[in-house]
Amino acid sequence: SKARDLANKGQEFEFYQVIMGGKTGKKLYDIIQDRLGKQIDENNNKLYNEDMKDTTPTVYLDMDGVLADFFGGVEKMYGVEHWKQLTNDKTKDLKKEVIDRITGTNFFATLPKFDSADSLIDTVKKFTGGNFSINTSPLRGDHENSAKYKKLWISNNIEQPDDIVVTGRKETYAKDKGTGTPNILIDDRPVNIQRWQAAGGYGILYQANRDSLDKVKKGLEGYAEIQRDQ
């Protein structure tokens, strides 16, 4: 359905504008996200790699929606209490308008930091033994500029990661190129997780403004269980 497709792509702007708004819209969006999350868990359980047992994965954190509050930045830019207020006018393409406004600017460097960001990083470091990396998508049509300001946000808001990847094809990092070990992606968009899994990686669907850190902890524990079973 159209609702499922928009939710799968993480396109909340379009979901609330095209499908419905208010509490009913949020409830439907959350139901779809939960179902997609169950599918992702099932796909992770099917993961098999004979090289997993003696190797440590790279854990990649997405930036927007996971560490940085993209929609909080939109609210600040428009001067509204909640971004969903902007979806009331169905005559305009809100996504295009927002992209046009932030293209070529320092928008990504100004994003609010989620309160859970540092705890999330600590959770990942505890799992890996002290390492974490960033894998984030650039703004389409503004790759170099958006990458610059995303890296600035990272340097200003969190401890330095082991690696910062800015790419429109996250799934190319799904497996270690040397050992074949499945790497882990923590991302708020189901479509990114699905592509990651299709490329042989392990995905954890996590949206900072709706999920608790327990979801990440359980996901990491699930990876460890797969390792033990090999």
Give each language-model segment a name.
Residues 150-166, 221-227:
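Structural recognition of alpha->loop->beta junctions
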Residues 174-179, 216-227:
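Short amphipathic alpha-helix with an adjacent loop that forms part of the alpha/beta core around
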Residues 184-222:
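Acidic, Mg2+-coordinating phosphoryl-transfer loop and its flanking beta/alpha structural elements
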